[in-house]
């Protein structure tokens, strides 16, 4: 995926799915670097490894570095019929069936609560499906399923959780857009750059 702001590429999101017998590891790296007059104005980095076994989310190992001094190490594992995780709010004992807040997984939109992989916390979510919409991916026009995604605010959040607009085609994430709460005038677009029919 390319990360676009004001028609300029400001970063990338790379996700790899590594299959190993009955498990899949989803390794994702998101890098954003905004410069204004060649001076760094905003940086963000997130690396996450999710492990899924027989279709069930069983562990996570991640790290998030925000533009300020906030850094979070995210760890979580299935233990004794619970999902034991740690992050911004310390250790959490969660429902074993919780799934990560990761937009590649279309089924995540059906959940009421998800595990935020950037901060290691639980958020309640609200999703609304809109009318299908034609979008272009690599100059190919497709009719995509469109959703609006909102999530609850944590008391430690520095601002509201941004509203996301998501587009899927054949259950694959193609595009998403949101406004950074600190940069409300400009929309951030994250769009597939490796897809073709």
Question: What is each model feature region?
Answer:
Residues 80-99:
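Acidic/charged, solvent-exposed loop-and-adjacent secondary-structure segments enriched in E/D, K/R, S/T
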């Amino acid at each position: 995926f390319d990360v676009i702001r004001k028609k300029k590429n400001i970063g990338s999101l790379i996700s790899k799915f590594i299959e190993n017998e009955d498990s899949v590891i989803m390794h994702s790296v998101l890098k954003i670097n905004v410069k204004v007059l060649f001076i760094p104005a905003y940086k963000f980095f997130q690396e996450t490894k999710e492990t899924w076994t027989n279709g069930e989310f069983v562990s996570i190992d991640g790290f998030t570095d925000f533009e300020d001094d906030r850094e979070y190490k995210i760890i979580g594992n299935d233990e004794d019929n619970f999902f034991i995780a740690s992050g911004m709010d310390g250790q959490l004992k969660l429902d074993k069936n919780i799934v990560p807040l990761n937009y590649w997984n279309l089924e995540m939109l059906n959940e009421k609560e998800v595990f935020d992989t950037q901060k290691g916390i639980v958020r309640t979510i609200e999703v609304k499906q809109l009318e299908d919409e034609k979008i272009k991916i690599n100059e190919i026009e497709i009719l995509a399923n469109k959703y609006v995604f909102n999530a609850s605010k944590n008391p430690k959040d520095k601002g509201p959780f941004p509203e996301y607009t998501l587009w899927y085609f054949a259950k694959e994430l193609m595009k998403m857009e949101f406004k950074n709460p600190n940069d409300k005038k400009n929309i951030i677009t994250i769009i597939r750059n490796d897809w073709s029919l």
